[in-house]
Amino acid sequence: MALPSCLKTGALMSPATGFNFSGSLMKSDSGFAVPTKLQSTRKGDRERLRVQAIFSFPPAFLTRNGRAEKQKQLKQELLEAIEPLERGATASPDDQLRIDQLARKVEAVNPTKEPLKSDLVNGKWELIYTTSASILQAKKPRFLRSITNYQSINVDTLKVQNMETWPFYNSVTGDIKPLNSKKVAVKLQVFKILGFIPIKAPDSARGELEITYVDEELRLSRGDKGNLFILKMFDPTYRIPL
């Protein structure tokens, strides 16, 4: 059987680099093969490539730490920009644009790729910024606006609840239907005025909500009307009453 040309010529193929090397092994007086200068050089090349690989591809824990630091930095920039805007009530168009740009940077490093399959979504979240005029009610006198708004989502029971605090303590509960691993269709069912007077929601009380970022501390969502919602975790143990 004919030998491959590389064996006929004494050429060796490096599996790591794909380059051909020519050379042979010399035998010592003891009968054991000893490496030639070329073989020693090849060993040095392999060591150099190994060192390069270590620095070109850092260990996984370094990459994870880098991502975590980036997320922390972007979140902090967003929260600092939101802080003086009274949940968005005093935000100018330029403020809204800047917040949206910062929010998109945070969304780009979302650590939870399928939020609706994660327990991180569950619990009571406090609204800290929104562009929704119906929630902010900025045209009303300040004493008639809700001081704090909460939203709860239970992915296990497919329920949603929005709550206001002082002065009216209004709330609304509804059902959610997953459209994919990030987005839900929302159908509101019952309003409670002053916290205890139930009113059935109209059939038109529908919408969609996409969770664009979530971790243990922060959640960003976008509605089907283009509104941005930014919430911080208030109580991870809270569950919507059935």
UniProtKB/Swiss-Prot annotation:
Residues annotated as transit peptide in the record: 1-50
Ranges in coiled-coil conformation: 63-87
InterPro entries recorded: PAP, PAP/fibrillin_dom
Keyword annotations from UniProtKB, A to Z: Chloroplast, Coiled coil, Plastid, Thylakoid, Transit peptide
Subcellular localization: Plastid, Chloroplast thylakoid
Keyword flag Transit peptide: yes
Location (main, coarse): plastid
Protein name: Probable plastid-lipid-associated protein 4, chloroplastic
Gene responsible for this protein: PAP4
